[in-house]
Amino acid sequence: MRAMVVIGHPAPASFNHAVAEAVRRTWLEAGCDVAYHDLTAEGFDPLLTADEARGRPSEDALVRAHIAELQSCDLMAVIHPNCWGAPPAIMKGWIDRVFAPGAAYTFAKGDDRGDVPQGLLRARAALVLNTGNTPADREQAVFGDPLDRMWREGILRYCGVHHVRRALYGVVATSTVADRAGWLADAKTLALRVRDLAAQA
C-alpha cells in the first residue's frame, strides 16, 4: 500500500517530528511504500495563487508532485501543532494548494454553488495527529475542538476519505519523558489501525 506522511512544524527537533517519524517507521515496517514530506524542510510555498483559486492547475512543480502523491496514496497521515485552533500557516497552505478542485474533489454539476461535493481521493483511511498546550477537556468544552471537525468533516470526508482517526497530544509544554513515550506508542498503535482500515476498505 502507498502511504503519505506530511509534517507541518518549523522546528526539525520538535515532538511533532518525533510523532511523524514514529508513524513513518510503523508504516514502513508494515510493508507500506511511504512518501514522507516535511513541508518546512522542502521549502513548500503555502501561498495559493490567483489561478489556483480559480481552479486552474498549479504551475508549481512541488505542488503538482504532492497532488499526484495525494491522488495515488491508499492511506495518509498529517501531523501538526494546534495554532489558534487551526493548522500552522504552512499546513493550511498545503491544504489549500494540494487538496485542489478536480484532484481531491469535484461537484456533480461541475460547479461549487451549493452542490454536494464528490470526493475523488483514492485513500479511504487517514490519521490526524495534533499537539497542543491546552488540556483536551478544555479544548473540547471551551473551543469545541475545531481541528477535529475541520480535518474529519471539512477536508477528509469532503474529499472521500471516510475512515479518520485523530488524537490530540498535550499538554506538551509540561509533559514528561514518560508522557511523550506514551504518546509515541499511541501514535504507532493508531498508525497500524489506520493501515488495517485502509486494507479493509
Residues of each region from the PLM?
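Residues at the starts of beta-strands that form the adenosine-phosphate
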Residues: 2, 33-35, 124-126, 162-163
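N-terminal beta1-alpha1 ligand-phosphate binding loop
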Residues: 2-32, 37
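Short catalytic/ligand-binding loop motif for oxyanion handling, primarily in non-cytosolic enzymes
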Residues: 13-14, 45, 85-88, 136-138, ...
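A short beta-strand-loop structural module common to alpha/beta enzyme folds
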Residues: 32-43, 167-170
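N-terminal beta-loop-helix "entrance" segment that forms/cooperates
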Residues: 39-58, 180
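Glycine-rich, highly charged phosphate/nucleotide-binding loops
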Residues: 53-72, 183-194
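Helix-loop-strand module that forms the ligand-binding subsite of alpha/beta enzymes
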Residues: 59-152
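Glycine-rich phosphate/pyrophosphate-binding loop and the adjoining helix
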Residues: 138-201
